Regions:
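A non-catalytic alpha/beta surface segment that caps or lines the substrate-entry region
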Residues: 1-23
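DPxDG-like acidic metal-binding loop motif
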Residues: 64-71
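A short, glycine/Asx- and small/polar-enriched loop/turn
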Residues: 19-25, 204-208
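Residues that mark the start of a beta-strand
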Residues: 25-29, 83
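Generic structural signal for well-ordered secondary structure
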Residues: 6-8, 48, 67, 94
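Generic alpha-helical scaffold signal
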Residues: 9, 61-64
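Histidine/acidic-residue-rich, glycine-tolerant segments that coordinate divalent metal ions
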Residues: 13-14, 37-39, 43-55, 62, ...
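Transmembrane beta-barrel strands of outer-membrane/channel proteins
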Residues: 32-34
Length: 210
């Protein structure tokens, strides 16, 4: 009853592996993400990305490799009851891939009862799993703050409204949320990933900062 189905949610792939018996009738989903990110792969390896400036980084190459390894093991041993659905999900970074696959019948079409997924984590000993109740890793949330001021010469900041300085104060203050507004026993992290101005000159105060 093994099968591979492509094109779920446009580019998602699902493989079904059957166990030795099917007394339970259960279908367990094992999921990995396979996004590509705008990063140049300079490993020089034979299997590196063939598309300039794009690679399956951020652990996604590891996730897909682990799931392929799990699928291979399940196919070779089949020492389980029911079926396993190995799910390769696209567009995890943008948050749209899971919804697209579900909307395309992922759960109903394959009758999946439960989903399991893992994320690699540096510092955890090889061959072990770290689990806990509730969230275990940080999420990537998108927010944008646009500051509009008055540009000017860096030597005359009193004649300008220095949006770069204001933005720097905001970035520093964001960390006060963690240290002053959250229970110190809770795991919290806030990191701003980008900081852009509309000026590339060293001696110019920018008009706008994003």
């Amino acid at each position: 009853c093994d099968e591979v189905v492509e094109g779920i949610g446009k580019t998602g792939v699902v493989g079904i592996v059957c166990g030795q018996v099917d007394k339970s009738g259960r279908v367990i989903g094992l999921r990995a993400d396979m996004d590509a990110l705008p990063i140049a792969e300079k490993s020089g390896l034979s299997y590196k990305s063939e598309i300039p400036g794009v690679m399956h980084a951020c652990g996604h190459d590891g996730h897909t490799s682990m799931l392929l390894g799990a699928a291979k093991y399940l196919c070779e041993t089949r020492n389980f009851d029911g079926k396993a659905a190995v799910i390769f999900q696209p567009a995890e970074e943008g948050g749209a891939g899971a919804k697209a696959m579900i909307d395309d019948g992922l759960v109903s079409r394959f009758g999946i009862d439960e989903f399991y997924g893992i994320h690699n984590m540096p510092g955890i000993k090889t061959g072990t799993f770290a689990i806990r109740k509730g969230p275990i890793m940080a999420s990537a949330d998108r927010f944008k703050i646009i500051l509009t001021g008055k540009g000017g010469h860096a030597g005359m900041p009193h004649l300008a409204v220095d949006t770069t300085l204001v933005a720097a104060q905001i970035l520093v203050s964001l960390n006060l949320i963690v240290s002053r507004s959250v229970d110190p026993l809770k795991r919290v992290v806030i990191t701003a990933g980008t900081f852009k101005t509309d000026s590339s000159a060293l001696n110019v105060i920018a008009n706008n900062v994003e």
